[in-house]
Amino acid sequence: VFSMQWLDGDSDRLARMESVIRETAEEIADTHEMALKYGPLLGLEPVAMDTYLREALEQSAQEHAPKQWRVMPSGALHDATNVSALMPAAMLFVPSIGGISHDFAEDTKEDDLMMGLKVLAGAVDRLI
């Protein structure tokens, strides 16, 4: 069993990526005489996060961590996607050690967690 997740904020690009992934998987399966079966796809559309909340996070990041942050339009299917149907939502990411994410080995340096909290607090201050 092998699973993949690919993310983007553009649904057309997601469809093109899926096509390339399927074609590549089929080529590999044919080369190695392997059976290939696809499970159910979520089929959820990416949702843009709230502009006002994102701007507050960006301004706070610039204040607390100048030149150490970037905008990351993930289009990810996080809880924020479901929440955004009911209320404004945005996401704040902090770096994982070694870039390992969504894995039991995922970890984050305490300094990065503290900086993330400062950025979040600064954004909240701007919003209230």
Per-range role (PLM):
Residues 12-13, 18-24, 67, 94-128:
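His/Asp/Glu-rich mid-to-C-terminal helical/loop segments that flank catalytic regions of hydrolases
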Residues 1-19, 26-29, 36-43:
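Midchain, well-structured core segments that form catalytic/ion-binding scaffolds
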Residues 35-95:
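Active-site-adjacent substrate-binding region
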Residues 1, 13, 17-24, 49-57, ...:
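General structural feature for long, well-ordered alpha-helical segments within catalytic domains
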